[in-house]
Curated annotation (Swiss-Prot):
It comes from Tropheryma whipplei (strain Twist). This is Phosphatidylglycerol--prolipoprotein diacylglyceryl transferase. The lineage of its organism: Bacteria, Bacillati, Actinomycetota, Actinomycetes, Micrococcales. Catalyzes the transfer of the diacylglyceryl group from phosphatidylglycerol to the sulfhydryl group of the N-terminal cysteine of a prolipoprotein, the first step in the formation of mature lipoproteins. Its EC number is 2.5.1.145. The gene is lgt. Signal peptide: none annotated.
């Protein structure tokens, strides 16, 4: 007998005249968790009680746009024969996490400079919250029928419903990549917190090391998961952008961790 993960029972529900997608519910829950965790951590680190709310609200649109753009560019063939508005239909799913990270990071440094906030201190506070929010987003992917893998005979294989998967053998089972990534994210959160409490505070690691570790560890994790991931559509460039993005995350993480050495050899107590 095969103990599989069943298809999602629902994709959403009616709230009066409004149809609410489960994907949206989990995305909202993730955003709230990200804000709460980051705000608490940043208050402990700096005493600043206002900046987190400003940063999260200011970065919301750039992050969504970057994530959506990454998804569309990664799956151009999916939209070639679709109505143009489908490019913007984020309620149907399709946000590329890596694109959101980089668009948010670029915009964040701008607002941090304007507000005169130590950027790497905030990024350290932010890192665990990003991963926690992504766990909720991956649950939303399950309800949207996204982020699954290739066929598997493992007992925790994912069973897909017929709707939307006519090109697949729905009698088979597939790797639940969304679940693997949730486990990966929780594992990285634990590592980050241990490093923060046991290593970074006792040594000369610069501020930003927690965020740098997040980028490197998540990038490595994506490299491990991508070969198992099933892509319903490919982009028109013959290039898997998720590998490129994962490599970029690792490189940026290493540069952030080494920036003091590269620039002037400053230590942690020299500030941001």
């Amino acid at each position: 007998m095969h103990f599989y993960i069943p298809p999602p029972p629902i994709s959403g529900f009616w709230l009066g005249p409004l149809y609410v997608h489960m994907y949206s519910v989990f995305m909202l829950a993730g955003a709230l968790v990200l804000f709460e965790l980051t705000n608490r951590r940043f208050i402990v680190l700096t005493g600043n009680r206002e900046f987190t709310a400003f940063a999260v609200t200011s970065l919301l649109i750039p992050v969504i746009l970057g994530a959506r753009l990454w998804h569309v560019v990664s799956h151009t063939q999916m939209y070639e024969h679709q109505p143009f508005y489908k490019v913007f239909a984020i309620w149907e799913g399709g946000l590329g996490f890596i694109g959101g990270v980089f668009s948010g990071l670029i915009c964040f440094f701008v607002i941090a400079k304007i507000k005169k906030v130590p950027p790497f201190t905030f990024l350290d506070a932010l890192a665990p919250g990003i991963l926690a929010a992504l766990c909720f987003a991956r649950l939303g992917n399950y309800f949207n029928g996204e982020v699954f893998g290739t066929e598997t005979t493992l007992p925790w294989g994912l069973k897909l419903s017929h709707e939307g998967f006519k090109d697949l053998n729905v009698e088979k089972y597939f790797h639940p990549i969304f679940l693997y990534e949730i486990i990966l994210n929780v594992f990285i959160i634990v590592i980050l917190l241990v490093l923060e409490k046991r290593v970074f505070v006792k040594t000369v690691f610069p501020k930003g090391s927690v965020f740098a570790a997040f980028l490197v560890l998540y990038g490595l994790g994506r490299f491990a998961l991508e070969p198992m991931r099933y892509n319903l559509q490919q982009n028109s460039f013959g290039l898997d952008l998720n590998y490129v993005g994962a490599a970029a995350m690792i490189i940026v993480g290493v540069l952030i961790a080494c920036r003091h050495t590269i620039a002037s050899g400053k230590l942690r107590n020299s500030g941001d």
